Amino acid sequence: MLERTGAEREHTPEILARATAWFDASSESARSRLLANIMAGLPGAYERYDVPGLKAALARYHGIGKADLRQNFMRFLAAVIPTAEEVGINMCVHPNDPPRPSFGLPRIVSNAEDIALILDAASSRSNGLTLCSGSLGAGADNDVPAIAGRFAERIHFAHLRNVAKESDGSFMEADHLGGDTDMVAVVTILLRAQKRRLEEGRRLRSKRSPPTVTDRLRLVCEISRTPAAPAS
């Protein structure tokens, strides 16, 4: 579809064979729909790319590998986190979505190892994590509850999503209790971390901050007229 140089080296022979079979059997309208979906909502795009525009954007990153991208991010943290500490801001990096190379671009926030490297690079509370259970859950080897537990004290924001994965690596958004991630375990870990912070006297949010996990659960319970369960 994109005729991107080197794309065939990034996929297994089985996926390439399936893609070729689909392309040969598909209509022009089906191909146009697929291309529109590929171009919709790409990261870093304020407007929808066309094929030449996407290729031009990708060309800017030619020769930049995972180590280069990670080193650049570490330089960013070294420059920004001290100021964040001074003014009381909690930075929180969002995991890559999907958590694997995309369009030939490397990923540096895809799993527990990546997260540990980032948080250790600036061992400050201001250098934290957005726990997106959907992004991390799309990785076949990611144990999202384990990641939540390991980095609980550095999680400053959470995107509570769930996804269902297929054997070929495809994934789709799922109901909160209908995907592959144990969302009850994830929420339990977050509530326990929130309780610890309250007991330590830590300020969880300012007046303008988004609601906490407990706030959201309480709202759901009020809507359903069910008493909210205490955090434990």
Predicted segments, located by residue:
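Histidine-acidic metal/acid-base catalytic patches
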Residues: E14-L16, S27, D50-G65, M74-N90, ...
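Extended, charge-rich helix/loop segments that form flexible
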Residues: M1-R70
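Residue-level "edge-of-site" marker
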Residues: D97
